[in-house]
């Protein structure tokens, strides 16, 4: 209510002061141009994802955070894509305590909050990973990974097992092979729409993808992509779900103990 009253007061002031309106439009235009043409490009590898089939509801609003960027679907109550960059972590990097709470994102008008997942049978699954982001980018960036616009429904057997192993491998192994690793990740949906039993606003994904682009010191790019179904078994090998592998053994024998 206070926020609505504040917005109403600001609008009333602007309408009664035409010069203020012109200044507001100018500042807003410059801010938008900076966001779209400069800021976003620094946080995405090869640009913002585009829809290949306009018949599919893929409209997203883009939210830029300290260490990752989100293409969020209000229709599905899910991030359709999240992009972040990994680099080799410093040996002196602080291991920060995990935040206790998930938070509604004000940019989503608080439409989805943590309670939407309560008693749903699904975990609040991070797309931009808490641990890696905290090691590389610090406390504020870590807190932002607990925004609900970074969260998607994952079965506990996936979120706490195979998906977690993927996050460990990308941070510990992939970053040791490349100068930097760009990651695009998000949920996939089939034609049948199913929502959380605890919320009619959050659609349940059928699978999840991760696309890795590893940049070598000489600029060579190696690509790896995986699609992991929601019902993946906890002891499945990650190699089973590779759909693109141009990474010359990016998942090598040393890691295979972790991939079982």
Q: Model-predicted segments: where are they?
A:
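N-terminal Lys/Arg-rich, disordered targeting/topogenic segments
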Residues: 1-15
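N-terminal module-boundary/linker segments of secreted carbohydrate-active enzymes
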Residues: 2, 20-79
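Generic hydrophobic, helix-prone segments enriched in Leu/Val/Ile
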Residues: 10, 34, 41-48, 102, ...
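Short linear sequence motifs
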Residues: 25-27, 38, 61, 95, ...
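Short, His- and charge-rich active-site/binding loops that engage polyanionic ligands
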Residues: 63-124
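Domain-level detector of nuclease and nuclease-like folds
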Residues: 106-260
């Amino acid at each position: 209510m206070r926020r609505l009253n504040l917005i109403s007061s600001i609008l009333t002031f602007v309408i009664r002061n035409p010069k203020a309106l012109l200044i507001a439009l100018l500042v807003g235009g410059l801010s938008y141009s900076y966001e779209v043409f400069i800021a976003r490009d620094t946080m995405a590898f090869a640009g913002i994802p585009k829809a290949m089939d306009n018949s599919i509801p893929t409209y997203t609003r883009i939210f830029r955070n300290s260490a990752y960027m989100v293409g969020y679907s209000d229709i599905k109550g899910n991030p359709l894509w999240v992009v972040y960059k990994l680099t080799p972590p410093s040996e002196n990097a602080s291991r920060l305590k995990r935040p206790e709470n998930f938070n509604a994102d004000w940019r989503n008008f608080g439409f989805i909050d943590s309670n939407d997942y309560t008693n749903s049978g699904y975990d609040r699954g991070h797309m931009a990973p808490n641990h890696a982001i905290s090691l590389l980018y610090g406390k504020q960036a870590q807190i932002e990974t607990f925004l609900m616009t970074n969260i998607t429904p994952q079965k506990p057997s996936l979120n706490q097992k195979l998906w977690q192993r993927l996050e460990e491998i990308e941070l510990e192994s992939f970053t040791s092979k490349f100068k930097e690793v760009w990651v695009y990740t998000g949920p996939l949906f089939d034609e049948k729409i199913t929502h959380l039993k605890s919320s009619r606003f959050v659609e349940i994904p059928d699978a999840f993808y991760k696309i890795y682009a590893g940049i070598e010191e000489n600029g060579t790019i190696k690509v790896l992509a995986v699609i992991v179904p929601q019902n993946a078994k906890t002891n499945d090998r990650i190699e089973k779900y590779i759909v693109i592998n141009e990474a010359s053994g990016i998942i090598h024998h040393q890691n295979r103990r972790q991939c079982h």
